[in-house]
Amino acid sequence: GLGDVYKRQLYILHPNNVGRCGHICNASYAVSKGSRGLHIGEKLVSDCLLEGKKHGFGVLQFNAVVASNVHARHLYERLGFVQLGTIPGGFRMKDGSYEDICPYYHVL
């Protein structure tokens, strides 16, 4: 059932920084290849927004969204995230080439 699908997904929510920037959180997500296309990423990000607020964070920030990850970028924008800009060549790919990254944030 779908319950088994959810057992193979996760996210990690943590402070993006410490001290005066400690109210900004960051998250990492993992969705198994076999579970893609089931809108689980959307459920994880939505839950993360709720949990971040519940734990006293004011902003959820994604530091390194790869520019070519159009599915994630579309999802984040649909959920109300705002792109901060573009960092040219900010992500080193497995083949050694570099790709732009697009930081995003969402006020909680």
Regions found by a protein language model. Give the residues of each.
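Conserved beta-strand-loop-alpha-helix junction that forms the acyl-donor binding cleft
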Residues: 36, 62-72, 90-95
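Conserved acetyl-CoA-binding loop-helix of GNAT-fold acetyltransferases
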Residues: 31, 37-54, 73-78
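Short, small-residue-biased leader/transition segments that mark boundaries at the very start
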Residues: 1-6
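Conserved GNAT acetyl-CoA-binding A-motif
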Residues: 52-65
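Conserved beta-strand in the GNAT
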Residues: 7-15, 26, 30
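Glycine-rich acetyl-CoA-binding "A-motif" of GNAT/NAT acetyltransferases
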Residues: 7-10, 71, 98
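Conserved acetyl-CoA binding element of GNAT-fold acetyltransferases
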Residues: 22-34, 63
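Conserved acetyl-CoA-binding loop of GNAT-fold acetyltransferases
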Residues: 77-87
